């Protein structure tokens, strides 16, 4: 079965519904299966944005036309492969001049609705977080639910010479300091999502970050983003999580339809179709995204 056949199998049960109703549902299903996730990456210079993206994602890289906001450019890159793609947006502002606060706030108000999630990177050995805190509270104060904080370069946590390269893990002393760092970041920012510490260089805790990333993503973005993960990070657990998020998104397409269901369609009929579509979506998920 190819992706087109899989999508057709999801759509087939809709034939028992009135045309206008089935068309409405079909449009949402097609948007769902063709969604291109957009992930924002932000953090001060040296936080390791490129290293983390390379450790997490794969695909043919092509530049996307930059977004201009005042004198600022927001760089965007598309990662493509096997019929699916995602866009990474490099977000400016953190650690730059406060003279441009109004400009940055306008930029983020414009661009944040386009993003499925923002990864905010903070170096493990960065103790000067007042700039990050200011940006969080004054520039991005209305977009907190879309942000996942990541403590990067955990292998550089003191005492850095104790990092266990063979076991790819921190020493007990480093582990304690990493815990204290993530707890400090959480206390300072009070984010919606948990703070995750990783080492992109060694691969330590990247699987934990992927799990947090999938959970933080809107359900409609989880499966297409999963297709761009590095192979070793796309585990059965991650696939299972993405599959459930996808079927949940399919299920919710029917919520608005059912709430305004026209008299020509009995709710029992619509619910039967809904159950069938969701069941088929779960069954053919693998053919859509792999």
Where are these regions (language model features)?
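Short glycine-/polar-rich loops that comprise or flank the Walker A/P-loop
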Residues: 84, 113-118, 142-147, 190-194
